[in-house]
């Protein structure tokens, strides 16, 4: 996840003039092996069974994937290169408060495992936005799809360009050579191999990411006298943060902000994002999908701990050794690379391994974006208009879409090179859009009275609020001339060799206390998803109730998660009818034998699919015209 990176400004200097070290031949070989092996894995799955591929195999891996590869792919999808660079730099400059983000992983993965996955899996979806049509109508589905496409197109270009830019500034590694190499390799194996190739390359790239970070921790700790010494040094300098229980949502990082605001951010990524939902649905069973979500939890904790340890080791290292002039003036996204090149400069091959680790994060994120964008474009925008599309043409079109989005990614990377400081705004758009989409799905899942008009108005209002606060915050920070010193204004924690200029805040603001709109814009970025999703739900409910709710409309029973029935059953019958609760209201027609409709090339699911849906837990209760989504049991 790239949460630590969303506000990191990018240094736009190109060339090798400020490089600490350059790549050796061995480093280039190690880095090249990453690209070659990723390409080989993709081509293997593309060539295997060539001529017998189906659209389901290309987009959904034939729904036969196991728990472990899906779990590692879920982790790799948003463990981007920007996060690998951002989290250690965050710890180095501000202390270990960021580590409490790990507390949000529990609910952030438990809720998708027991709410989103059962509903999505039992509806046998391909695109997450099919749910919106089943629950509301086609217009809501298209709105959700277009919003997701906008989000991912912006982000994937930045995710490709940003690490290449940092690498170029630090090592002199050619900027556009790395951009083109990554873009072309990723494009080929994603377009030809489909989701199965993406998942298995994600597995390989996840192992490379862990290995690269582990090498830095081991070598760095050994160089300064062990992890015990690292902990002692960082503790003495005040880098080990206590629990900040300040409830103020305008404080950037507190325990509540990280542990609870982070839950909504996690839900927007692991609950409703198409890239992740697609992996859940590619599992061979619902149980495997739930287990894969569980397995992400320890993997995320390990990834977070490794990133934080790199930040602590980097601090202890520069407490013992002098910093180069380049590092003292480095942009935040370059700190880790400068440290790695300084630490491993006498060990040929290891700098190349860390760069391979860095670009593994980019490859996994970008390939997931290509594949998910091709899937939603095919399922949500093309097939509904061309229901008679043959299997052969559908396969060619799916591959063509993935390839086309790859070209768009390269184009966005080129545009990013001309954005300058606006690059930060482009990165933040990813977070701005995730919250409203989460709110839209929650509105449909938990509130049966919500209608299509309420969903659309709620989504548009949520997006408006998201961009207002997000862009306003960025503009407010950019206009600030002075940045506060880190760690509550004290520079006493810094090693003697570190200047305050080298650790200026990631989210600068003026030293004077903000007032009015500036105070409003200073809302912690980790609360963005919570604020924006709540806006969608509240506005959507108000509009729905004012326009009659779901009275007179059919409600697909498989699209509602049965949490509220148990709570609302405690209310008087008159209140339940007013809320249009279908278990007691006769205003909502429910056909007794209605199974969720799933369109596939214009054809409804047959009786075999209906039997399979019944086996998966969507069961009809004879005593009442409702369906109950059974609890997931492991």
UniProtKB/Swiss-Prot annotation:
It catalyses: biotin(out) + 2 Na(+)(out) = biotin(in) + 2 Na(+)(in); (R)-pantothenate(out) + 2 Na(+)(out) = (R)-pantothenate(in) + 2 Na(+)(in); (R)-lipoate(out) + 2 Na(+)(out) = (R)-lipoate(in) + 2 Na(+)(in); iodide(out) + 2 Na(+)(out) = iodide(in) + 2 Na(+)(in). The keyword Cell membrane applies. GO terms for cellular component: apical plasma membrane; brush border membrane; plasma membrane. GO terms for biological process: biotin import across plasma membrane; biotin metabolic process; biotin transport; iodide transmembrane transport; pantothenate transmembrane transport; transport across blood-brain barrier. Glycans are attached at residues 488, 497. One of its GO terms (molecular function) is amide transmembrane transporter activity. Disruption phenotype: Intestine-specific knockout leads to premature lethality between the age of 6 and 10 weeks in around two-thirds of mice due to acute peritonitis. Growth retardation, decreased bone density of the femoral and humoral head, decreased bone length of the pelvic, tibial, and femoral bones, lethargic behavior, hunched back posture, and decreased biotin status are observed. It is found in: Cell membrane; Apical cell membrane. Expressed in the intestinal mucosa, liver and kidney (at protein level). Expressed in the colon. Keywords: Biotin, Cell membrane, Glycoprotein, Ion transport, Membrane, Sodium, Sodium transport, Symport, Transmembrane, Transmembrane helix, Transport. It is a multi-pass membrane protein. The chain crosses the membrane at residues 23-43, 65-85, 100-120, 142-162, 175-195, 207-227, 255-275, 295-315, 350-370, 403-423, 427-447, 455-475, 526-546. Interacts with PDZD11. The C-terminal tail is important for biotin uptake as well as apical localization in polarized cells. PANTHER family: SODIUM-COUPLED MONOCARBOXYLATE TRANSPORTER (PTHR42985), SODIUM-DEPENDENT MULTIVITAMIN TRANSPORTER (PTHR42985:SF2). Belongs to the sodium:solute symporter (SSF) (TC 2.A.21) family. This is Sodium-dependent multivitamin transporter. The gene is Slc5a6.
